[in-house]
């Protein structure tokens, strides 16, 4: 049910967003939410088409008198990142979200909210259902599988679209207009390790780390947030007799890992020394990690005896994880100093019955700049005997500061809000880069209300930014 303080203005956006929070919509499981959009289209006598990938386009006729204006594409993705805290019982494939309002923010109870990109989807649906909005012909493009590799945009049948002006509503800082985004690529490293009984006299332990902030591996990578995988490996670095048994750290390629555990065997002396080091490790991390990470906990618990990797293989794997880069690698010389040009996210580790999977991803504006980082990462993986599977990359969106759409949007913002909007590129993989490659003559702009903590259980939407966002969107459409 809606929390008592659930916002009501603008009515159409908030009602659609609430309905979207009732419908499970993980990546690659968007059928139910797509059915909701189709139902809205049919209820308002709008034609729609579906491509082979599952992307949906709804064709909204122009307001009376606007029929000859150029068609505008409104683009959003249907899926959401599905992350929860370790103590939260929630099935993202079945359960609706539990909403809360705190200090002017809308959030979910210990799960992602899906405002990324649900609030944009809600705005697109509001354009369909609000009879008071004046607009040209619209093509509402709802893509799928954005969060796990931009699969919907990559597979889009562009022949479904006639518009050459596009508004993407998937950025997260109000009063900012985005005209460029990073490209990306990644790897999954794997290996099967033989297992053996733990050495005589060894005991089994589980080292768990929780309480980090985590977050978006693009727009928050420059914040120097703690990486649970790097910290766990650092904690085990001095355990000379460590033999790995199992591990689960991180959830997805585009999420900075916030919690996880590693199970291992070691001799009694090493276990005792590690137990004594836990508080010192946490104090050291607190001394340099941002305040958002100061809730971290490091717990060492006895575990049931288990088969383990050899001492040599365990050392080798821990060393390669310690050596693999993570975080911002280069900053722009042309844009504001906080714009990251090149980054890498060491995202996920799974070890189950000797089977290793290790995932990492990079983001970049210039693919040539990423070549050296790619070489370094793959060289480390080869030294550790890991099988390398490259994840297909996607293009960035090169900024066009001479865009006619941008000029009109800036002027409108100044008139409506008496302020000059910031014009930026974003270090994240918006679908705009792929869509621009499919529609090379399209003029594209991205904006949205304020969201914080995307891709984490602290994701929240600033309620007060939604009314001016809606006012701006509808005013811009009235001018196009």
Model-found features: residue ranges?
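Acidic/His- and Gly-rich active-site-bordering loop/insert found
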Residues: 4-105
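A short beta-alpha structural unit
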Residues: 18-22, 261-263, 297-309, 345-349, ...
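A structural supersecondary motif
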Residues: 241-251, 334-350
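His/Asp/Glu-rich mid-to-C-terminal helical/loop segments that flank catalytic regions of hydrolases
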Residues: 159, 225-239, 270-271, 315-325, ...
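A conserved active-site cap/scaffold subdomain adjacent to cofactor or substrate pockets
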Residues: 222, 253-328
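Zn-dependent metallopeptidase/amidohydrolase metal-coordination segment
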Residues: 13, 342-343, 347-356, 361, ...
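Fold-level recognition of mixed alpha/beta catalytic cores in primary-metabolism enzymes, strongest
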Residues: 136-228, 236
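Active-site metal-coordination/substrate-binding segment of hydrolases
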Residues: 66-164, 314, 325-326, 332, ...
